[in-house]
Structure formats: structure tokens, C-alpha cells
Amino acid sequence: MPIIEIQCMESNPVISFENTEIAFKSKTDKELKKARFIFSSMDYTWLVKLGLKITPWAIKNKLPVNGLIRKTIFAQFVGGETLEQTTVIAEKLRKYNVQAILDYGVEGKEDEANFDLACDEFIRVINYAGSEPNVPFMSIKVTGFVRFAFLEKLHETILKGEGTLMKRFLKAIDELQGGEKEEWHRVRHRMMRICKTAAEKNVGVLVDAEETWIQEPVDALTMLMMDTFNKQKCVVYNTIQHYRHDRLQFLKESCQAAVERNFILGAKLVRGAYMEKERKRAAEKGYPSPIQPDKESCDRDFNAGIEFCINHIDRVALIVASHNEYSNLYATQLMLQRNLTLHHPHVHFSQLFGMSDNITFNLAHAGFSVSKFLPFGPIKDVIPYLMRRAQENSSMGGQTGRELSLIKKELERRKNS
């Protein structure tokens, strides 16, 4: 990986994602050795597959596995079981100029009482973030406060319509009957509460991406909130998954809508998290896969998305949420070419807590605005999140190998220093 020299008025920092001293300066030797053990375990695909089957079963049957999970994979990828525990991690990150994106990691509790409780918890997170300058964003999943089946039905109706996404969405809402109409009003009220509180507290809301078969109403609801709250500053961000072959065009159409409606488009760019599930469903149901044909196509669209956003930086607030070293370096190069300040309010970088510290901490050291995505919640509630992390790291052999090589390199450096 080449070293990129960055010219700026205040200093002349150099970014190298090979610098493990900077990457792991927040970690003790004990913490690094534990991380080495976890990533080494994830290198064994059969072990991960076994864990994916056994862990949910063990939790469901109340077997005493919480302690083991808490000390291993949970500690590596999750901030804590409560908001209060997570604030300790956020404060530790602050010492290294790394910010935190808080994510209340609860998924799939399908009843109105739990939807209201989840909404209340999102509000509590926003209120905390509003008092902490080191927590500029919080993340929400719309499925945390909306029935999956309701979103699925809306999605199917939207797809049948004609015209822009918003026209099709509003027509789908008009066609709702009786209880579903009331359900939509409750959904909109929850989303408005969250975004209004965030706007008042100066906290950004990152709306997580969902499966393709419920994504249309999520996109439309997010666009509706951006049209309401993003007039003067960017409060609401949509998450755009570039492992889908249609998302670069969607990004451009979203920007056009922002221009026409005079709001700032919030765009958190990711590669994606549901690839295997998407391919499997497409094959089972006999429709064309929404997934890119290969990794090169995904990388091409992701980097093109970064360039598009930076070329329209007055209208787009960009979050580069990536573990790909080239994409992060590419974004920094584009910023420099366009003479953007390192802490430009419309450019932010982010990586998951527990991964790619070499990117996060070296970007922070160089002066860029960067954060760790920091989920929290009871172990039983964040199991879906942890299962995805294990699955992704196992399937991304290169990523796991990269994490291991960097950790080993730093342990060796410390041993010899």
C-alpha cells in the first residue's frame, strides 16, 4: 500500500495504514493477544459455521454461554450491554481523536410495545450524544420500530408504481386501508420523533440499510425525513449499499431530488451486509440477483460513489463507511485535489469497532474526521449483529488475514522495542 503525503496548512501529515504503532496505541498487549485469538478463530470457516448454529440455540435454551460470549466476540465488536458501559469506550476513543457512532443493536422484536420502547431508547441515545461532542452520529434500523411484513407489503406496492420513488411511495401510502393506515401514522410519528430530537440536539441520524425486498419504503421514509430536516444542515443520512448493482444510479437520483427539493443529501456509503442472503433468495424465488456480478464491480461503483459525492460536496454530506484501504485513501486524495479541509463538515470516515484500527487511528492521527461504529445492547439482543460480524470476517478471508498480520506485526514491534 503506497504512502500518500497530505499537504495542509497546519501540518504535513503522512498516512500509512501500515503504521501499527498508531493503529493499536489504544490497545494493551493483553487486548491485542485476545484480538489475535478471535481473528485466528474466525480464520477457520468450519468453526465459525458451528458457532453460528450453536450460539443462537444455546442462548434460546438458556445455556450458560453469556460469560464466554461477553469475554470474546462481544468484547471485540460491541461497546457494552448498556449505554452507560458504551460511554466508557467512547471516552477512550476520544483520547485518540476518534469519534463514536452509537448503535442500539436491537433487531426484530415484532410488536407495537417493543417498537415504542425501541424508539424511546433511540431518543435516549440521541440525548446522550447531544451532550457529547465526540458522538456526532447515532444509527437506527427502521426494522427496530416497524413490522417487517408491513415494509415488505409497502415495498411490493411501490415497485408496481410509476414515476419517482417519492411519487410511488406516496401513492402506496394512499392505498393503505384501515389498520395499516394507522400503522403508517405510528411509523411516521416514531421516525419524526427521532429525527426532530436529533435536529434539536445536533446529532446525525444514520438510517441503516435493509434487505432489498423492504428497502424501497426505507429509502422513501428516509428521503421524507431529509426533505424535512436537512434544509440547513445534514441531520438524516441514508445508507447506500454498493454491492447492489443499482445503487450508484440511486445515489445520483437521490442527489437530483436533493437539488430539486433544496435539501442536503446525507449519504453513508457501504459495500453491504446481506450479500449471501440476497443471492439465496433471488435463486429460490427466480428473480435476477440484485447483487453485483463480482467484487471488482462493487469496488468500481463504491469508489465512483465517493467521487460523485465529493464532486457535489455542497449538496451531499458523505460518510465513507469502509474497511477497504484503497477506498479510504482514494477519498483522502479527492479531498486534497479539491482543496477540502481535512475536517470538512460534509466528509466523514467510519469503521466498525473491533476492526480496521489501522485505518481509523491513522486517519485520525493525520487529522481527518473519523469514527468507530459502536453498537451496544444486551447479549441476547445483539446476537444477530455478532453473527454477521463472524460470518463476514470468515467469508472475507483477506480481511481476517489482514487483521491478523497487523496485530502480529505490532506485537512483534512491542516485543523488540
Model-found features: residue ranges?
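Positively charged, amphipathic and often flexible ligand-engagement surfaces
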Residues: 2-417
